[in-house]
Design a protein with these regions (language model features):
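Ser/Thr-rich, low-complexity intrinsically disordered terminal regions
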Residues: 18-131
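Sec-dependent bacterial lipoprotein signal peptides
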Residues: 1-17
Length: 131
């Protein structure tokens, strides 16, 4: 009986030590931050909001491409709260060779995170269209 309790306790401890999947993603692009963010924004509009993607039905997007901080971004916000906190941020910033594109926000911890990352990775690489 004691061995069973010990095994159960060990299983609980090991499960607690498991790291959660990351709630962000980061990609590199040879393009300038404004160019890569513009390309991403065009594809976000066409693929996520121009089609039948039900995961984005409750949201709208707000491209902020004219950035004084040189960090243009695309925000995914709830339709009901367009000025509320974004649920997804796609931000481009200058890097040593081109741009770094970061994705973060609550949607990156949700069921669409992998599909979001795959789409943005393609667009950062210069591809167009929906996956």
């Amino acid at each position: 009986m004691r061995a069973i309790r010990l095994a159960a306790a060990l299983a609980v401890l090991l499960a607690a030590c498991q790291s959660a999947p990351p709630d962000f993603a980061e990609f590199s692009s040879p393009q300038s931050p404004v160019n890569v963010a513009t390309h991403i924004a065009e594809n976000v509009g066409a693929c996520w909001f121009g089609g039948e993607r039900s995961a984005f039905a409750e949201y709208s997007y707000a491209p902020e491409l004219n950035s004084y901080s040189n960090r243009p971004r695309v925000l995914i916000v709830p339709k009901a709260e367009p000025h509320g906190l974004p649920k997804l941020v796609i931000e481009a910033s200058a890097a040593s060779r081109g741009s770094s594109v970061k994705l973060f926000g609550p949607m990156m911890a949700g069921p669409e995170a992998q599909a979001i990352s795959r789409d943005v990775a393609r667009w950062v690489g210069g591809a167009t269209g929906c996956g």
